[in-house]
Amino acid sequence: KTYRKYHFHVWKTLVVNFKLLPFKQAIHLPIVIYGKTQLIISNSSVKLLCSPRFGIVKFAKNHEYFYPTPAPSLLFMINGTMVLEGDVQFSSGCTLRINDGILQLGENVCFSGGCKILCNNRIFIRAYSQFAFDCVCCDTNFHYILQKDGLVKDCVGIIEVGNRNWIGNSTTLMRGTQLPDNTIVASRSFVNKSFLGYHDDGILIAGSPGKVVRLGDQRVFSAQKEMEIRAFFKKSKMTEMWLAESDFFFYE
């Protein structure tokens, strides 16, 4: 049952922590399970690169209400490792599936409702990156393909997402994806290659397959700046653009 004061599942939270973490870390309950979550865990572990404390990972907590509460969520770890550098949030309806793989998440990474993270090899998502609802991050094709020349390529690869990335809703990141810092991926895009050759401070990727459509764009991550910009447009309804000051910060 749900513990009414904090609205998390006490029993599932205890099971996950003491199955995945050393005892001295598990007693802090760094992983908190919310909502209607199915647990499938075997021979797996979580490694903390930060000090253990309550609620570093909030799994299936509905914080933006793109999905109803409780939407079914899945935490599946078999022979898997999750490395955590700081706070991470998975909203309701998310699937986290690590099977013979390593998933490393930077500080303040956030997955909105319905996201699927499928890791069979290696996925590394750096700090402050955010995934909008219904995104898929998958480092495997699951099945092998026999080519005309008789060769068969490996079906697994790696995915690397840089710092402060914003992945639009319903986007798919497949094996081979490498995104630099301050990247925006437009909604419903499909990405499966490296964009690390771009040295501009911010790129915008869109389409299927994903292509760079604009350089120099960055998501405004600062909540304070977003409030200022929103207030400006509410007051100046006839104005289409807001001009940033020279000392403007995209994130804080």
Protein language model regions, located:
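Short helix-loop boundary/capping segments
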Residues: 137, 142-148
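A generic "structured core" feature
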Residues: 174, 180, 184-186, 190
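Flexible glycine-rich beta->alpha loop in the catalytic core of nucleotide-sugar glycosyltransferases
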Residues: 143, 189-190, 196-197
